[in-house]
Amino acid sequence: MSMPATSTKTTKLATSLIDEYALLGWRAMLTEVNLSPKPGLVDRINCGAHKDMALEDFHRSALAIQGWLPRFIEFGACSAEMAPEAVLHGLRPIGMACEGDMFRATAGVNTHKGSIFSLGLLCAAIGRLLQLNQSLTPTTVCSTAASFCRGLTDRELRTNNSQLTAGQRLYQQLGLTGARGEAEAGYPLVINHALPHYLTLLDQGLDPELALLDTLLLLMAINGDTNVASRGGEGGLRWLQREAQTLLQKGGIRTPADLDYLRQFDRECIERNLSPGGSADLLILTWFLAQI
């Protein structure tokens, strides 16, 4: 594959360490897509509210992206002496090249564009922290990623142009900042909510898949998911959040019998053409950070 230039500065990171984190990123993507049943999302049971993609597309996509994750880590290390605000500019060509390989692997289907952005940021943050011999925890990784994105929401969402992107339109209409806002804030939905929730359930001995499904419900209940809003408007988003919150209040996903509630939720999401892809991306980050 064609590799964009990154930096002339050398790193002291061992290839084995870089590959270890890249492998975790790949495993995170596979863990999320194979998790079943997920309301409105592609999984092992069905294609959710998507008519243009299947489980195999996500498997091919994750493999293509895995080859680029070491480059994000390496650039994070190579740019460790740069001002954090300057790092994002250098990450963009790597992200675009990674995105190109994703589209080639899926014959043009957008399976993991959001994950390229978020995992790319976290991998670059990991590279920077390792290079600087700084503490590497979920919190420091996310705060470092946030420092790369300082001012991103203002630059890319607040505009008076007549030709608005989907993200700009949702920001102006509903105040949703999407993946950019979550990254710039240091992934608070993950750090303050999803990750501690998931780890607590694991500590209680809950089956890991059930724990992840319950954590997905939590994210769906609290995330202003632009994927949902772009398909169903504010009404669709509020409905999905309310349904997820109701399931959590009833006890969430604690036993295999509770999966029937998710299957019904899935059918309703498909009928409404709603897919919480933004929450799925955050679930990928949750699992990834739980391994650090």
UniProtKB/Swiss-Prot annotation:
Gene: citG
EC number annotated for this UniProt entry: 2.4.2.52
Family: Belongs to the CitG/MdcB family.
Entry keywords, A to Z: ATP-binding, Nucleotide-binding, Transferase
Name by which UniProt lists this protein: 2-(5''-triphosphoribosyl)-3'-dephosphocoenzyme-A synthase
Organism: Escherichia coli O17:K52:H18 (strain UMN026 / ExPEC)
Gene Ontology BP term (one): prosthetic group biosynthetic process
Catalysed reactions listed for this entry: 3'-dephospho-CoA + ATP = 2'-(5''-triphospho-alpha-D-ribosyl)-3'-dephospho-CoA + adenine
Keyword Protein biosynthesis found: no
